[in-house]
């Protein structure tokens, strides 16, 4: 299965609780943390919600 390399580039400070929870759900809780996530529709939806806070690479 394909994976996505996701890096947090934005701070969750002054963001809505939903956006903070989404970052935690993705395994990102600190700036410049990188995770390899499976490319699923669920993960894509979460990334769309916090697109302004993360950088996605294939």
From Swiss-Prot:
Transcription regulation listed as a keyword: no
Keywords: Ribonucleoprotein, Ribosomal protein
Swiss-Prot/TrEMBL GO biological process terms: translation
Entry keyword annotation includes Ribosomal protein: yes
Molecular-function annotations in GO: structural constituent of ribosome
Highest taxon in the source lineage: Bacteria
GO cellular component, one term: cytosolic large ribosomal subunit
Subunit structure: Part of the 50S ribosomal subunit.
Annotated family: Belongs to the universal ribosomal protein uL30 family.
Protein known as: Large ribosomal subunit protein uL30
Organism: Zymomonas mobilis subsp. mobilis (strain ATCC 31821 / ZM4 / CP4)
Lineage: Bacteria, Pseudomonadati, Pseudomonadota, Alphaproteobacteria, Sphingomonadales
């Amino acid at each position: 299965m394909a994976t996505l390399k996701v890096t947090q580039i934005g701070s969750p400070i002054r963001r809505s609780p939903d956006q903070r929870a989404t970052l935690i759900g993705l395994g990102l809780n600190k700036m410049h943390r990188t995770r390899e996530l499976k490319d699923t529709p669920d993960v894509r939806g979460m990334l769309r919600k916090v697109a302004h806070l993360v950088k996605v690479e294939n």
